[in-house]
Amino acid sequence: MDFTYSEEQEAVRQLAGQIFTDRVTHERLKQLEAEAGDEGPFDRALWKELADAGLLGIHLSEDVGGAGLDFVAACLVIEAAGRTAAYVPVVETMVYGAEPIARFGTDAQRKTWLAGVAAGETVLTAALAELNGEVILPGGTEPATTATAQADGSWSLTGTKACVPAALVADAILVPAQCKAADGTVTGLGVFIVDPKATGVTLTRQSTTTGRPEAIVELADVHVPTDGLLGEGVDGAGVVNAITEFATTALCILEAGACAAALELTAEYTKTRVQFEKPIATFQAVGQRAADAYVDTEAIRLTAWQAASRLASGLPAASEIAVAKFWAAEGGQRVVHAASHLHGGVGVDRDYPLHRYFLLTRQIELTLGSANESLRRLGRILADEPV
């Protein structure tokens, strides 16, 4: 892997960093939290600015209003969002939704949905968790939701999904389902583009660790037109696998940004906090704890970017993604615990920004597979490889 950025990628990194740093302040986040309704905090002004700067469609093709760059460019935007804990659904829209439509969608689907993403007019997400808490993962849980083919070529979807991020503000939700013929015969997996305002769709708000609400999505004989099935003649299982892989990697990148920011806050605090007439950063125990957190942060960053680089290059990345998610889950919680500990009482003060990184990291830890689940996935991959 080449760890240097191209000129275009460096420009994206700098632009995204500047916008997020300038617009996402502690005071702005507190304001959004205080004004949030049932849909949760959503910085629509920032969302528009990201669109105007061309960042929301940075990884989309130029024919739909994008910049024509790759998944790495999208991850640079996501990492900047993680560093500021911004209230914008960049992971959900750019990766859960737009990435699979860009890769597998028909020309009509791409033009219908991706132009709106690039313009900041469309929010997308995907429903990857079952009601019982099981997550649709490669080689793991199959979706319980069913899609029954109708005589006119349309589909009828029935089932329930849980913990769907950004569902309350989404314009469309990608829903994996077991496809069935009219006689009930299972014909394979499919991913369907569902309008959350369609008849038969019920959204129930779910509170989360971060305060960014998710939703239970209930589907009761929801009519989905023929062109609502993502792609044409594509392998549905492959689409589901791709969504999960890209989404998991994006969360690891988001985590890398959050942990880096938490560590920077900690470094600054320990340099200015004086005890026994010395900055506590000069104490050996403090330095050792911070050094351990730095090692974890670098491991999270490097493994996440390795996974992102392989995905962007079209290379197999299942084992790299499992390793990255393990580090994001296991290492991430160590980083934010160390950061909170080294801050003392300030670390748990909600008037101080550290708590947002703590909560974001803990939520990512258990999203799309915990550390143990990631190790199990890696074990299955290694066991299947010929010696």
Q: What do the predicted segments below correspond to?
A:
Residues 2, 13, 45, 76, ...:
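Glycine-rich phosphate/cofactor-binding loops in nucleotide/flavin-utilizing enzymes
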Residues 51-111, 115-120, 164-172:
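Internal helix-loop-helix
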Residues 309, 317, 332-358:
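A glycine-biased, small/acidic residue-tolerant capping/turn segment at secondary-structure junctions
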Residues 28-38, 267, 271-279, 294-327, ...:
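C-terminal helix-coil-helix/basic helical segment that borders enzyme active sites and/or dimer interfaces
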Residues 120-131:
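A short, Trp-centered hydrophobic/proline-enriched beta-strand micro-motif
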Residues 127, 154, 158-201:
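A short core secondary-structure module
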Residues 1-88, 380-387:
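Amphipathic, small/basic residue-rich leader segments at the start of a protein or domain
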Residues 2-8, 12-15, 83, 201-298, ...:
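Glycine-rich beta->alpha junctions and the first turn(s) of the following alpha-helix
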